[in-house]
């Protein structure tokens, strides 16, 4: 019996690993931290393993460059643009790069992107890029992996790195620092992956491609829902905000963003003196909603059973359990993402019963990435964390309302009422006063049908 076995029998409640210095020196980064060695995996002797690095033709860091949200330059992938093992086609950031940089960092169909820097929870997020129609590049906290397809298909590598085993291998190599965690790509290459017959890898490839196809069809249907909404409001679906602003001036390209108000019309009425609040674009949106043919209402006129979350203590957190804690980072654009959640002790429910989630509830983020909204589509046992507005609604379709809340029509109202410095915050009272156009029931049904079909395909893709 070796020393490790002796210690484990004597102290079964401890994670212990005893190593020779010579064994530690074999590690490419000379790892001596306990988490690396105590999380070591057991391999199946019946399988053929290779190091990931032995199966790659190339690995490459992304480009470090300034980015913008104005659409100037080439779309650039960041850490949050990877979702459910796929690289999203719609990205928020762009970068001005020259031809040589584009040639160096342009993504190719079938490239695998690995997120080397993120929170401990999300580091190692991996997705495959399926686009050969447009130019995309990738940022420096991502790494491009190009597989030798005679040995390892990119779809299989992507799936493996997203499994429990793959994530454990990644996290044991993760190096925590202030507010983020990093994984050295050279250590990633040291991970051993079972090399299955190509026939099996091709089956995985087909499943991933079918998933991607269903997801793209889902996005097209959701886009149809958005187009139907904007057309109903008399806006151009291709650029709804610009079409609204252009309709308010005879010389749209040279219009100045100027708004003049008396003290009575401004501070004494709203309590706000900051110039940003009185930008003409916000007033144009408000006028458009107020003039909608079927009328308008305030959000509070549609709301039932409202709450704004509870500040649960980290002492109540658990890695596994039955009671899920919904945090702001779980709210995506119209989607509740439960892939990375933490749990609460069951008795935490008693701390704030009003913050228990029900199927059909709508959630809106109130801090940071403000105004993100989704519908709770399933029966789940969950509580909402602080700074999340939760409510049920009446006399309006929940999917259509969430579409409105995530559109520029409501996003810019949230932007206008936001307060704070480094992190923007929303008041639940101010949020309930935003304006909502009262879309007629026939149009709501049409929009809701597109959305339901979209989410059915999204569910199929998973």
Feature locations, PLM:
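A short beta-sheet element
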Residues: 78, 105, 109, 113-160, ...
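Short coil/turn segments at secondary-structure boundaries
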Residues: 65-73, 172-174, 240-245, 312-321, ...
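Non-catalytic DNA-recognition/assembly elements of restriction-modification systems
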Residues: 1-63, 197-310, 440-462
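A short glycine-rich beta-alpha junction/loop motif
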Residues: 135-143, 175-199, 382-389, 420-443
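A structural connector/turn signal
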Residues: 101-102, 178, 351-352, 378, ...
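Sequence-specific dsDNA recognition surfaces
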Residues: 49-65, 80-111, 297-314, 329-359
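Elongated alpha-helical scaffolds
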Residues: 105-112, 137-139, 152, 185-186, ...
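Glycine-rich, acidic and aromatic/proline-enriched surface loops and short helix-turn segments
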Residues: 163-166, 407
């Amino acid at each position: 019996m070796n020393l490790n076995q002796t210690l484990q029998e004597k102290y079964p409640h401890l994670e212990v690993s005893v190593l020779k210095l010579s064994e530690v020196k074999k590690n490419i980064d000379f790892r001596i931290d306990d988490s690396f060695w105590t999380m070591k995996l057991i391999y199946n002797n019946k399988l053929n393993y290779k190091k990931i690095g032995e199966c790659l033709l190339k690995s490459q860091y992304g480009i470090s460059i300034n980015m913008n949200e104005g659409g100037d330059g080439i779309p650039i992938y960041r850490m949050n643009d990877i979702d459910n093992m796929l690289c999203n086609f719609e990205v928020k950031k762009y970068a001005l790069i020259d031809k040589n940089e584009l040639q160096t960092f342009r993504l190719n169909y079938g490239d695998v992107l690995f997120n080397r820097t993120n929170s401990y929870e999300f580091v190692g997020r991996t997705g495959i890029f399926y686009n050969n129609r447009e130019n995309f590049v990738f940022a420096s906290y991502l790494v491009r992996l190009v597989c030798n397809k005679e040995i390892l298909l990119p779809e299989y590598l992507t799936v493996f790195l997203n499994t429990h085993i793959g994530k454990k291998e990644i996290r044991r190599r993760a190096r925590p620092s202030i507010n983020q965690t990093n994984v050295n790509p050279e250590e990633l290459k040291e991970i051993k992956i079972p090399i299955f017959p190509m026939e099996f890898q091709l089956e995985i490839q087909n499943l991933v491609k079918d998933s991607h196809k269903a997801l793209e069809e889902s996005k097209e249907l959701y886009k149809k829902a958005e187009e139907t909404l904007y057309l109903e409001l008399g806006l151009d679906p291709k650029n709804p905000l610009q079409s609204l602003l252009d309709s308010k001036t005879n010389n749209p390209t040279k219009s100045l963003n100027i708004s003049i108000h008396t003290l009575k019309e401004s501070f004494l009425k709203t309590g706000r003196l900051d110039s940003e609040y009185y930008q003409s674009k916000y007033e144009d949106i408000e006028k458009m909603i107020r003039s909608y043919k079927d009328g308008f209402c305030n959000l509070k006129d549609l709301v039932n059973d409202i709450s704004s979350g509870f500040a649960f203590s980290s002492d109540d957190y658990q890695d596994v359990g039955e009671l899920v804690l919904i945090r702001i980072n779980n709210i995506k654009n119209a989607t509740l993402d439960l892939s990375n959640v933490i749990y609460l002790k069951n008795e935490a429910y008693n701390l704030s019963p009003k913050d228990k989630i029900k199927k059909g509830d709508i959630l809106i983020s109130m801090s940071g990435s403000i105004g993100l909204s989704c519908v709770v589509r399933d029966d789940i046992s969950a509580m909402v964390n602080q700074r999340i507005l939760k409510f049920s609604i009446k006399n309006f379709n929940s999917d259509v309302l969430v579409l409105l809340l995530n559109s520029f029509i409501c996003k810019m109202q949230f932007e206008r009422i936001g307060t704070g410095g480094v992190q923007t915050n929303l008041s639940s009272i101010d949020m309930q006063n935003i304006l909502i156009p009262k879309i007629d029931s026939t149009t709501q049904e049409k929009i809701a049908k597109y959305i339901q079909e979209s989410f059915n395909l999204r569910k199929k893709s998973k």
